[in-house]
Every structure is written in structure tokens, then in C-alpha cells.
């Protein structure tokens, strides 16, 4: 159940006035001014890496190796398969969790920059790191009886 929740709640916002951290669904950050500014150039992307800022961009392709390619505007970003979601390496999360993100916004942090064989700069990103942060700072602190803000997005027909 926890992994299903993580697929939708992995975006962090720090509310300036009271320093409270809130985690919202992917897609909530992509059109914000702060996100657009961070994606505006190489220097702002490097600053986001240094600060471990959670960014959001559209996943454009899932490669044959199940790496996600994200459009960072000025350069390309790659989320390697093992950094795409918690549980991918162990098989607890299936590859469809990555494939289904194509064409949709995904949250990530930039962990490194590399030049490809053609000399083009590529950002190496991690979606899993954001999920782990959400788990450590939010989900693991929930207690039975806690009331959390949520939106029902669809119903699933399954039972015990």
C-alpha cells in the first residue's frame, strides 16, 4: 500500500511562512515559477543540484533499459531505471510504474551531470531519492487516526 501512495505523493513544498513541509502529487510543481526558473539554464540546474531542490519535468521517453528521459528545457535529463522508483531493484515495484510515467510530469533531484559520447551535457536524476525523502519525512511519521489531506482520483475494483 505504501508504494501505491508514493506513486502519487512525492512532491515537496516548503511553505515559507511556517517552515512546514508538505508533499503533493506529481504534476503540482511543473508550472510554478520556481520550477520554471530552476529549469531555465545550466547554472540554475547546477544550483538545484547543490541544494537538492526537487524539480519536476515531463518524462518524454522510457528507453529499452527502462531509463526515463526527462525534458529539462536546455538539456536532457536521465532517470536511470534503478533511480526511477522505490522497489524497482528488488522487483517489489514493476517496470510499468516507470513506463506509465511517459508523457506525465515526474519529480526528481539532480544527482550528477555527465557528458554523453557527443559531448552534450546530461543531468543524471533520481526520482527514488524524492520518494525516500517523502517516506522518511512524512509517511513513516503517520500514525493510526491521523487525518491527512487527500483527493480521490479514481476507484479500483479489488477486494480481500
Could you describe each region identified by the protein language model?
Residues 3-160:
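Single-stranded RNA-binding regions, centering on S1/OB-family and related RNA-binding modules
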Amino acid at each position: 500500500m505504501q508504494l501505491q501512495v508514493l506513486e502519487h505523493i512525492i512532491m515537496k513544498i516548503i511553505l515559507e511562512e511556517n517552515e512546514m513541509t508538505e508533499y503533493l502529487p506529481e504534476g503540482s510543481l511543473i508550472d510554478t515559477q520556481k520550477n520554471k526558473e530552476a529549469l531555465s539554464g545550466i547554472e540554475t540546474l547546477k544550483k538545484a543540484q547543490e541544494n537538492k531542490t526537487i524539480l519536476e519535468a515531463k518524462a518524454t521517453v522510457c528507453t529499452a533499459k527502462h531509463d526515463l528521459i526527462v525534458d529539462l528545457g536546455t538539456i536532457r535529463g536521465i532517470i536511470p531505471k534503478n533511480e526511477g522508483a522505490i522497489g524497482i531493484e528488488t522487483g517489489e515495484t514493476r517496470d510499468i510504474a516507470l513506463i506509465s510515467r511517459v508523457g506525465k510530469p515526474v519529480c526528481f533531484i539532480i544527482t550528477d551531470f555527465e557528458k554523453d559520447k557527443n559531448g552534450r551535457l546530461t543531468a543524471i536524476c533520481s526520482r527514488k531519492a524524492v520518494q525516500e525523502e517523502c517516506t522518511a519525512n512524512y509517511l513513516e511519521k503517520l500514525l493510526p487516526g491521523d487525518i491527512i489531506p487527500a483527493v480521490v482520483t479514481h476507484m479500483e475494483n479489488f477486494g480481500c
